Amino acid sequence: MGAELVKWVKSHKIDAHIITFVAKMPYIDSIKLLEAGAKGCVWKTSHPAKLNRAIDSISNGYTYFDSVHMDCEKISSRYSSDNQLTNRESEILQLIADGKTNKEIANFLQLSRKTVETHRLNIMKKLDVHSGIELIKTALRMGVCTI
């Protein structure tokens, strides 16, 4: 809902600098808000002084990220249009996050194991991760899976 509202405001050329208040949400949802055009993120539970800082920063032409969102810029670069996962890559990432092996994924999707391995390498490259553990951590941040 939040990202759609931000997009609506931007599509109607309303001159507004949008700060989003977020509760507990996966990083991918925060990133969707930012990609939609929000200028900052502040947690609902943050001290009111952080909102004042956000307003000051944004009114001076900067963006503002609550300290818990500091990874948003780093992570959002992983989801730029150049790095967007394909539907197949997203599907494979979900299966990896579910604990499936390359062989199990290949059987399930009726692909060769080599094709799955290639998709996995492409996913890791796009997400700028270098190990299976980093891949799972990123999947958690994206909201692909939960603990």
From Swiss-Prot:
The gene is ygeK. Residues 78-143 form the HTH luxR-type domain. This is Uncharacterized response regulatory protein YgeK. SMART domains: HTH_LUXR (SM00421). InterPro entries: CheY-like_superfamily (IPR011006), Sig_transdc_resp-reg_C-effctor (IPR016032), Sig_transdc_resp-reg_receiver (IPR001789), Tscrpt_reg_LuxR_C (IPR000792). Lacks the N-terminal receiver domain usually found in response regulators, which is usally phosphorylated by the cognate histidine kinase. Pfam families: GerE (PF00196). Keywords: DNA-binding, Phosphoprotein, Transcription, Transcription regulation.
